[in-house]
């Protein structure tokens, strides 16, 4: 018999006694009975990994006295499809069917209320759809800016110091649920990160130098921001970038990233432009100030990309356009084994695809995600399985 304690985001504890041979699915069933929900809504996390239903308690390494974090997702609302009854055909006027003609008024009268029922159900269906959109919008994911500060304050109310909370959020890529899990269970060694570089007050107060005559791009469109900044500073990128870096006191072409981040960004831009947007999203989640920094200094960002791809910005923008149009990244073990990473298609690219990568991708697919999506996120996260799982659950879970 193994005694385990299950905790959630609110630090509610649910003790359960299990057999080592019990599967995770059986464990979820017992836990669901204790907290009054369905086992399909429960996710169990231990040591930074989502436990699979098919494995047993002993196979997951759970021992007597261990603590497991559980998260309960919102129950999907099911819409009942209302089918409109067929309209009664007009009665014939032939002499042989006079009886049916005489009976038609009563039939039409009884069919009228039934025909109006679907019309009355339309607002209810619209209300259900609105409720689903609201629930989807409120699903917790990455938090940045003011929302991140509010999250820190809420977690501090649980008894943690601000430094501990910020460290956990950085390790969890700004995912509140995962950060609380790390505070309860400890941050894995491979996710411990050094303190981020503090941005100077001059950089925060520096006004944007983008041209005011051109139409401003959407706030969330980093590519349009960067492209507009590149056009505005065409022919003078070196001068503008040098002035910006001099004001910030940093090296040329620096926008506050670590060396590892720059290497990953340049590698993705050079060999796989389609994965640039997921990588930027991942980096922005770890460095909340990066997004504002790029929008305030688009010319520095463009200069860095140009340096990475040899002044061929068109390839980067075409890769981003292809990604938006829905092209998928296709990587197969056979192609990698035969050294065929570079195909004939325009969207092909070469990657190191090992059997370990195939196993990791298969495990992520077992969580219920499409293989094409898993491959994109997995390689965008530099083959970090835990980071890929975090992004999949945060941004792509239904």
Swiss-Prot record:
Domain Ubiquitin-like: from-to ranges: 1-77
Residue list for modification Phosphothreonine: 94, 139
A single BP term in Gene Ontology: nucleotide-excision repair, DNA damage recognition
Start and end residues of each stretch annotated as Disordered: 75-149, 195-216, 229-252
Keyword Kinase: no
Ranges for domain UBA: 146-186, 355-395
Cellular component, GO, one term: nucleotide-excision repair factor 2 complex
Presence of the UniProt keyword Nucleus in the record: yes
Position(s), cross-link Glycyl lysine isopeptide (Lys-Gly) (interchain with G-Cter in ubiquitin): 49
Localization per Swiss-Prot or TrEMBL: Nucleus; Cytoplasm
Comp. bias regions, Low complexity: 101-140, 229-249
Modified residues (Phosphoserine): 121
Subunit record text: Interacts directly with PNG1.
Other notes: Present with 10900 molecules/cell in log phase SD medium.
Name of the protein in its database record: UV excision repair protein RAD23
Biological source species: Saccharomyces cerevisiae (strain ATCC 204508 / S288c) (Baker's yeast)
